């Protein structure tokens, strides 16, 4: 009889410790552990980009509520994640602040099984250059000066191409809007705190396909300007 009671006590005590540790974790008493569980790594390629953008918008909204600010989300520049008691998302964001584009860094802690989401940090990326390697669609570690080829499917390159198409449309008298089909070829160059893009774009207008050579400049504030555009004939 005594032995059975002793065994029951051991089982009950073990369960109590386990439940207490879970409660402490869920209440957020694990900040020290968060930094120790896993290193920061790239977001998996198969992760939904819409999910990352949703976290980015959440971070901006939460910051605006807490600080009574009016920052506007523009795009996700870079996303990394860290396995903790859940996942800590490290985001570099392009933000519109009083009409000017600026870079911010945010950390969002997510525990999906509890439907828990919390903004841990939101600050200006003061040490980040205005033009980064990701702005040129280049791999980290590439530092050669001058013009270099960049992938046409890079998000930043596509963003620049789409802005160029919008400007071409604004300057056109056509009733049919231009649609970007493909970035056929792209080169980029960093000059000081600005960047230049030379691209060959395949566009569609109505049933007709056309190619345009464009040169786009990006200044230190992130503003894009279509410097030159002409039709290209193969």
Swiss-Prot record:
Marked site: Reactive site: 38
Main localization (coarse): secreted
Bias (Basic and acidic residues) ranges: 140-154
Domain Cystatin as annotated: residue spans: 38-126, 145-215
SUPFAM superfamilies reported for this sequence: Cystatin/monellin (SSF54403)
Keywords: Acetylation, Phosphoprotein, Plant defense, Protease inhibitor, Repeat, Secreted, Signal, Thiol protease inhibitor
Gene3D superfamilies: 3.10.450.10
GO CC terms in record: cytosol; endoplasmic reticulum; extracellular region
Listed InterPro entries: Cystatin, Cystatin_dom, Cystatin_sf, Prot_inh_cystat_CS
Signal peptide range: 1-24
Subcellular location: Secreted
Example of a GO MF term: cysteine-type endopeptidase inhibitor activity
Motif Secondary area of contact in this chain: 82-86
Residues covered by region (Disordered): 133-154
Pfam (any one): SQAPI
Transmembrane segments annotated in the record for this chain: none
Family: Belongs to the cystatin family. Phytocystatin subfamily.
Function: Specific inhibitor of cysteine proteinases. Probably involved in the regulation of endogenous processes and in defense against pests and pathogens.
Protein name per the record: Cysteine proteinase inhibitor 6
Species, as recorded: Arabidopsis thaliana (Mouse-ear cress)
């Amino acid at each position: 009889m005594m032995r059975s009671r002793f065994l029951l006590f051991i089982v009950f005590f073990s369960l109590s410790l386990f439940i207490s540790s879970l409660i402490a974790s869920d209440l957020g008493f694990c900040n020290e552990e968060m930094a120790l569980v896993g290193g920061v790594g790239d977001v998996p390629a198969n992760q939904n980009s819409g999910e990352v953008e949703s976290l980015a918008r959440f971070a901006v909204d939460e910051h605006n509520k807490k600080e009574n600010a009016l920052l506007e989300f523009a795009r996700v520049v870079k996303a990394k994640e860290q396995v903790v008691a859940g996942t800590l998302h490290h985001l570099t964001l392009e933000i519109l602040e009083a009409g000017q584009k600026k870079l911010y860094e945010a950390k969002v802690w997510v525990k999906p099984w509890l439907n828990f989401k919390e903004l841990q940090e939101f600050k200006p990326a003061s040490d980040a250059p205005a033009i980064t390697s990701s702005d040129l669609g280049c791999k980290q570690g590439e530092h050669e000066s001058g013009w270099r080829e960049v992938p046409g499917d890079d998000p930043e390159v596509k963003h620049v191409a789409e802005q160029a198409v919008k400007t071409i449309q604004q300057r056109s008298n056509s009733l049919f809007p231009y649609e970007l089909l493909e970035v056929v070829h792209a080169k980029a160059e960093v000059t000081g705190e600005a960047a230049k893009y030379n691209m060959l774009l395949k566009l569609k207008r109505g049933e007709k396909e056309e190619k345009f050579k464009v040169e786009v400049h990006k200044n230190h504030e992130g503003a894009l300007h279509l410097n030159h555009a002409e039709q290209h004939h193969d």
